[in-house]
């Protein structure tokens, strides 16, 4: 449940930042944008869109697609790095979940605030001692680096001169598009669905809400903005699916094997409870749990090798 709440808060924060940035560009009475954000971020992207649209004769729709692809390719390594860190921490947390079960059980059964606080402190200490991040390795730096690129292409797609009067495949880029809105909702739903693949059933039930948060948010934003911006989000949705496919079917399996190999070579130490009243019981249970998990993982690993040899 905590992971689900964390994901919802992170998505809400990302959307809030995006909405904040969309309001940073001022528009004069003539409908022309101005200000520091526009001059710094929007103008270079707008010039690039104009170059492809007019100087290369490709039209504004194709120009927005090309520039969006360029931007997304540039920031794709950052997105994958962010996914790698988050997935690595998630796999480590999944590995340690049985080891921390005695503490989690005390946390669930705590009858007083003091008992609950003591169990939470033990859990945080155990996670810290084993190099686990409380924030899942998400980190803000990759997101902050990506945001200027997102905002630049967003402003350029909306305010580049000539875009509002252009058409693309029968769509008026200066008007709202229900068609693009529906497609965008589907794309981001698929991306959310892919993110749940390979997740344990218990956690998947908790993450169900996340399958609808992003698509619904994108629908509200797409339906209220011109088709030129929706076209940018359409291409962004395709890249999000590509990134999620790489994360789910390439990164996660590799990281899962990496974590198992790490702790097979260097088994985690039994965590000793700081709770004097339950110190012996907790330590004994934790030690037994450690040994059982390590033995199980070694057995599974050897069985896999024998199967491959056979």
Swiss-Prot record:
Residue ranges, annotated region (Disordered): 262-310
Subcellular localization(s) per the UniProt record: Cell membrane
InterPro entries membership: YidC/ALB3/OXA1/COX18 (IPR001708), YidC/Oxa/ALB_C (IPR028055), YidC/YidC1/YidC2_Firmicutes (IPR023060), YidC_ALB_C (IPR047196)
PROSITE patterns (UniProt xref): PROKAR_LIPOPROTEIN
Family under the similarity heading: Belongs to the OXA1/ALB3/YidC family. Type 2 subfamily.
Known role: Required for the insertion and/or proper folding and/or complex formation of integral membrane proteins into the membrane. Involved in integration of membrane proteins that insert both dependently and independently of the Sec translocase complex, as well as at least some lipoproteins.
Protein's name in the database: Membrane protein insertase YidC 2
């Amino acid at each position: 449940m905590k992971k689900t709440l964390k994901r919802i808060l992170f998505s809400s924060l990302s959307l809030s930042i995006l909405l904040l940035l969309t309001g940073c560009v001022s528009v004069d009475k003539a409908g022309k944008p101005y200000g520091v954000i526009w001059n710094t971020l929007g103008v270079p992207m707008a010039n690039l869109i104009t170059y492809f649209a007019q100087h290369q004769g490709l039209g504004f729709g194709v120009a927005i697609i090309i520039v969006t692809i360029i931007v997304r390719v540039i920031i794709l390594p950052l997105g994958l790095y962010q996914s790698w860190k988050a997935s690595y921490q998630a796999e480590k947390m999944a590995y340690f979940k049985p080891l921390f079960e005695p503490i989690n059980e005390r946390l669930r059964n705590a009858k007083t605030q003091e008992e609950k606080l003591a169990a939470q402190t033990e859990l945080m200490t155990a996670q810290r001692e084993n190099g686990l991040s409380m924030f899942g390795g998400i980190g803000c730096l990759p997101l902050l680096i990506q945001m200027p690129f997102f905002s630049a292409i967003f402003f350029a797609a909306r305010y580049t001169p000539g875009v509002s009067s252009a058409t693309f495949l029968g769509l008026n880029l200066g008007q709202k598009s229900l068609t693009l809105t529906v497609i965008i909702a589907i794309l981001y739903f698929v991306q959310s669905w892919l993110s749940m693949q390979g997740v344990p059933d218990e956690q998947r039930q908790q993450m169900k809400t996340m399958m609808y948060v992003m698509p619904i948010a994108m629908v509200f934003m797409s339906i209220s903005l011109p088709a030129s911006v929706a076209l940018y989000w359409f291409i962004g949705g395709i890249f999000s699916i590509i990134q999620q496919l790489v994360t789910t079917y390439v990164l996660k399996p590799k990281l899962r094997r990496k974590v198992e190999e790490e702790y097979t070579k260097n088994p985690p130490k039994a965590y000793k409870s700081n709770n004097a009243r339950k110190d012996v019981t907790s330590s004994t249970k934790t030690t037994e749990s450690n040994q059982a998990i390590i033995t199980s993982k070694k057995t599974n690993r050897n069985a896999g090798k024998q199967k491959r040899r056979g």
